[in-house]
Regions:
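Structured beta-strand/loop patches that form or line metal/cofactor-binding pockets in enzymes
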Residues: 1-14
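Active-site- and interface-proximal helix/loop "cap" or "latch" segments in soluble metabolic
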Residues: 7, 25-91
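Active-site and channel-lining beta-strand-loop segments
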Residues: 12-31
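Short amphipathic alpha-helical patches
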Residues: 22, 67-72, 102-110
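C-terminal charged interaction modules
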Residues: 84-116
């Protein structure tokens, strides 16, 4: 079997504006392949798998002006997309549905259920 080789490199960048206490005041991100340049953001959760240590490295940041309501929505949507990603990556649909059920419970408890 032939070994695959890297034929292209791409970059996603995040720029964080900090205050004197190193608290994020602003965030902008760019993705060259997605044709996104300097798009504003209020929060990010970056997780990277370190294969040498079998460990997840994380960076979680949010701007000072992000409201609690926005954070609740951000977490809810992130958890839902994690269920989708897990199912796509592993084919484990039953546990992914369990996670989606939890997301429904989370939304109820946080009082962020979409109106019907």
């Amino acid at each position: 079997m032939e070994e695959e080789v890297v034929t292209k490199r791409s970059a996603i960048t995040v720029k964080i504006g900090l205050n004197a206490n190193n608290l994020p005041l602003e965030m902008h991100w760019s993705a060259e392949d997605g044709k996104i340049e300097n798009a504003p953001a209020k929060a990010m959760m970056l997780s990277l798998w370190n294969p040498e240590d079998n460990n997840t490295m994380k960076i979680d940041l949010w701007t000072k002006d992000m409201s609690v309501e926005e954070m609740k929505q951000f977490f809810h949507q992130t958890l839902l997309t994690m269920a989708d990603t897990f199912e796509k990556a592993t084919g484990e649909n039953l546990i992914s549905e369990d996670l989606r059920d939890y997301c429904y419970h989370f939304a109820e408890k946080m009082d962020i259920m979409p109106e019907k």
